[in-house]
């Protein structure tokens, strides 16, 4: 049989582009999801936390739907927690509070403007790191950087141009000595938009940073309520000595490193940071450049 779409009659799942060569392949494609694959991830439970200012992108929603299907297939328990907050710092702390009220083994931050691959999360789980993230490009295009590489003769294809336009919000212990193990490397700071955190990390921070507890009523999804398990682990950080300002993601990594912990990044899977791009131009330039 050739490649086609088949409907799994038990789960109403569309199996797209499944390569069917033999009768056994056909039966496997029809097999209900709960009978497929392995129990490798059964011991884990993921709490997906998303702080939202107003809405989320369709790309984020598509990624979550696909991830939920993959978790179901791998028998991995997953729950989703979207919290509305005008402050991303407060939103992340509220996600932590919700995570602590759950029985999940891992907190997975996925921001509402991120499109990720489920396989990246499963790889990070298997890496077994305390804090591990998938770094994503900033919402800016580095044209000067790309032009410099072009002058140096390092641009050989359109893909080279695309890759040269990006910069990533991440710091490493030693830029001259980067060690990569199965796509995983140690970092000092990385973004929180796609970050997996072990429960033990939060529990140790509660023990070591008791002064960061928050006890006050908070507006949650329009309701003014008491929220237990609130801790200020995500907050901006100003360094008066270095005269630098860091976001809540780098500040969180520093809290963990100050306790002797390490942070890591998984860098070999593609990820999308969804943002607006303004396509500015005038047709006159097209006429001039074509001469």
Where are these regions (language model features)?
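Active-site acidic short loop of glycosyltransferases
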Residues: 43, 102-105, 129
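C-terminal catalytic/acceptor-binding lobe
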Residues: 2-32, 38-43, 207-291
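Conserved catalytic core of nucleotide-sugar-dependent glycosyltransferases
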Residues: 96, 117-235
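Residue-level recognition of beta-strand->loop/alpha-helix junctions
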Residues: 82-84, 135, 267
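Active-site nucleotide-sugar/metal-binding loop of Leloir-type enzymes
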Residues: 93-106
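Short beta-strand-to-loop acidic/aromatic patch adjacent to the donor-nucleotide binding site
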Residues: 104-115
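Residue-level detector of anion-binding/catalytic polar loops
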Residues: 77, 130, 262
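N-proximal low-complexity "stem/linker" segments adjacent to membrane-targeting elements
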Residues: 2-85, 90
